[in-house]
């Protein structure tokens, strides 16, 4: 469904990504994890063409992603980014309806099917009560939910999510991840919360310093040894009473340092 082969990217000053390869099969939920600055967001930006790789290729549904027009890509791939400021005073519903633009002609109006889909997604994301409210007045978490709703209304077979649970309360984090999972679409998401990644992702790619350091199922990847190597923390990994993988981090004690 979505794959990258040998993606490398850098600026004049430094190399940021080194020959990154990954694959997400149809209906698979794939997570990209790693510490801050490891290249997760940069990799996604190369996949949705905000940045152009120096080397490598990407494919979506068997076709060259980097050669697709913006409209072709938008009909197959929806993206949710971390930045969500808007200089225009649109209502929540208007922002969500923008997800249908890739399916429309230049002057084509929304039809009953479009309106029904928008209504359904507003309900699923619990945004009905603020649908007429200005997007600019929302909290960071509410804005994030609006952008996720817009991506769902785009109705593409594949989703790219860059830190989708940022700014969200734990309730909405869990609701969002569960909603994305049950939709059955192909998902590639950069995720900071390792317990959420363990709970919802079928496969993980671990990045460090612009390279893929490990990949596999959560059980294969989220080990105390790898967490120590990648994140420089001590952790225990176990299963809870429901059989779900859980990570328990140990406190970091700065022994021998002066008190502040």
Feature locations, PLM:
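ABC ATPase nucleotide-binding domains
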Residues: 229-260
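Conserved ABC transporter NBD signature motif
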Residues: 56-64, 73
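Catalytic Walker B motif of ABC-type/P-loop ATPase nucleotide-binding domains
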Residues: 159-163
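Helix-to-loop junction immediately C-terminal to a conserved catalytic motif
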Residues: 48
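The feature captures the beta-strand-to-loop junction immediately N-terminal to the Walker
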Residues: 33-35
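Conserved ABC ATPase signature
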Residues: 109, 134-138, 142
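Conserved ABC ATPase "signature" region
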Residues: 97, 112-130
